Structure formats: structure tokens, C-alpha cells
């Protein structure tokens, strides 16, 4: 299991229309699945198009789903996930 810098997660009320929980659910991701990605091996990059504390993580859930998440890394190990989507295997091109 990977050691994560982020171990606490900031979630909006699940009934908030424009909150991060509802936004993830619109992409068929449950908050628990997003959290699981931080506790398995993952690839991490800064999102230079945004602010310094915004990152992209490619991780996997306990059930093996591969997800890409965009989140803000806050102080004291807190992560606020903004959005995410499932990484689908790419089809090989025929030449």
C-alpha cells in the first residue's frame, strides 16, 4: 500500500447541487472510490494550468477501477477533490 500525503478529505454536503460529491457522482464516481485512490499506488502530477496546490492523480479503487482525479492539496494532509473520471483502456490503432 502506498503512503499518501493526503489522508483526510473535504466533501460538500451530498445534497448540495453544485458540490464536489454531486459532481463526482455525475461522473459515476462515489467519494469513497476517490478516497481509495490515495491509498494504492498512484501517479501524481501538478496541474500547472491551475494554482500551485492543484494536482492530478491516476489511481485505482479497491475494486480495481482506474480513476483520474483533480484535487487541491491543502494543509495538514487534506485533499479536496474537484472532479474525476474513469480511465478506460485505449484501443490500439491499426496501421
Describe each region flagged by the PLM.
Residues 1-95:
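Ribonuclease/tRNase effector modules and their secretory precursors
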Amino acid at each position: 500500500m502506498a503512503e499518501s500525503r493526503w489522508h483526510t478529505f473535504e466533501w460538500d454536503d451530498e445534497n448540495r447541487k453544485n458540490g464536489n460529491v454531486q459532481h463526482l457522482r455525475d461522473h459515476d464516481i462515489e467519494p469513497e472510490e476517490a478516497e481509495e485512490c490515495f491509498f494504492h499506488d498512484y501517479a501524481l502530477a501538478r496541474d500547472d494550468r491551475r494554482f500551485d496546490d492543484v494536482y492530478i492523480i491516476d489511481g485505482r479503487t479497491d475494486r480495481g477501477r482506474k480513476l483520474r482525479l483533480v484535487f487541491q492539496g491543502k494543509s495538514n494532509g487534506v485533499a479536496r477533490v474537484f472532479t474525476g473520471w474513469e480511465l478506460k483502456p485505449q484501443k490500439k490503432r491499426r496501421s
